[in-house]
Amino acid sequence: MNMGRVWEYIYWRLPVGKRQFIDRANQMLEKVDGLKQTLELGIKNSYNHRNQLYEQMSRKIDGLSREVRKLHEENTRLERIVTHYHKQDMQMFWEEYRKEGETTIDAQKRFFLSLPKAQGINRNLQLLEKDLLRAFSEICEENQMEYWLYAGTLLGTVRHKGFIPWDDDIDTCMAREDIDRLKEILKNNEEYCLTVKYDAWGYCKQIRFGYKNSELPVFIDVFPFDWACLASRESWEANHRVKMELKAELSNEENALIREFRAAGCVDVDSVIGKQVAVIFDKYYNKLREDHVLCDKEEAEGFLFSFDSWNPCDDSNINAVSQFFPLQKLEFEGLTCNVPNQYMYILHELYGEDFYTFPCGEPHFIHADWKKNKKLLAEEVKKRVK
């Protein structure tokens, strides 16, 4: 049907004359054209307005980016100045503090050993953690499982013979297979437990030794490590790649299990979700074994902090076996505890050459707020600490 016949069809059904019909049709066409022009103009104006807004936003973002860069550069400059003067102040301080005939390092050791212990809430927390470390160490020794003190706890052991006064946690390390053994050994223990949880947002396992029946979440951290075929950069890179692959898979919320896991945040390894998540973690561990990155203790030349550990997977996390084993013994708060064989080398690697100095800036990361549990914390100390 052509348009002429359409108009003819409409014309014979309208109660108006031909002239009136044509006039009315022309009026309608003019209105349609007007609406079309108005619509096109509106679209054009909207498009132009959007472009103007985009340009304005781009200019503002560029300006803010420049400001951020300037602030970052200024902050870096100020940090260098503060660090410079901090070092100068420290040099002057140690020069004044040093006794006649005493070396600077001996003066530093004397100073840090003379610092008073923590007080109040922080000290009560430290005392409970010390009690846990005592039990942890005894259980490991009785069952021929090797552990050692690490990070801030190792620094405190060497520098303070105990806790750094402003610290509030204990860090230990253990081989993956010994952690599995320890969990089994403690299964029926009435006093202590080893909790192992998958952390959806840390992309790792949280492993903690603590009291079985306690109203307070007091614990010591246990970081796993794996035996490596080689103490090489290539081993670290393979471990790091797997860590990144695990992180990517645990971020994929198109997967229903991952959505459920991330909604829960943290799940016990023995829970329904935990057992499903374990399949993902085990897949990456088996990959490292199959690729001959990881091996058994007897074949290892090095070890890696595990890809599923909370520890950051940086390039200091590959070590030769000889740097850590055989373990040595040092005093920590009156306890005799394991430390790495070359513990001074490890501390220099972690904290730089001069760890016998005051921290520049904020010295302490607060791991938990215990003020609301102050009374309960004191009661737990009386009950448990001998």
Where are these regions (language model features)?
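Beta-sheet entry/capping signal
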Residues: 146-147, 171, 329, 336
